[in-house]
Amino acid sequence: LGIGGLPRGRVVEIYGPESSGKTTVALHAVANAQRAGGIAAFIDAEHALDPDYAAKLGVDTDALLVSQPDTGEQALEIMDMLVGSGSLDIVVIDSVAALVPRAEIEGEMGDSHVGLQARLMSQALRKITGRLSQTKTTAIFINQLREKIGVFFGSPETTTGGKALKFYASVRIDVRRIQTLKEGADSVGNRTKAKIVKNKMAPPFKIAEFDIIYGQGI
């Protein structure tokens, strides 16, 4: 990153295609924060956190505050409350795509919910970024890549949740699987590339490559 780790008091976005290693990278950051004596929270909007895997990466799962909210509003309210308490060092939101607004969950099929999630993210980030900075808490938002429909020029990929996160994030990390690692005929892991796409704290566009071994992490 060029600054010796993830910045405190800032928003970090880790994004990439499915199964690219985003959550693994975030859990390693949690483990490092805990090792340094920090308190960590994991807001599991995907309802997919595997405590055994997290423990293998060095996460103290007993000390990790885990919340599995039902709606996007609830997830962001919990985050705001935890950050506002001032006792947290790092919080991970997995993932932005799973922060579904209440109206969408309770609404009828076929109702138009265009822009609801983007508005929810924009309002929440406006409020939360100030608090993160005051309390020196690092927030990691994990985000999925989607294909934009009908794009002929430029990248057809886009992240979910509107433009707010792109704007408010101090660091954005693009994580991709570039190769499957094999031992004989068995797949044992993935070679992964992380590119710093935006960095307000140091020059961006640095690239790191590392291996993620199944069941063990980086």
Swiss-Prot record:
Gene: recA
Top-level taxon: Bacteria
Lineage: Bacteria, Bacillati, Actinomycetota, Actinomycetes, Micrococcales
Protein's name in the database: Protein RecA
GO cellular component: cytosol
Binding site for ATP: 16-23
Principal subcellular localisation of the protein: cytoplasm
Subcellular localization: Cytoplasm
GO biological process: DNA recombination; DNA repair; SOS response
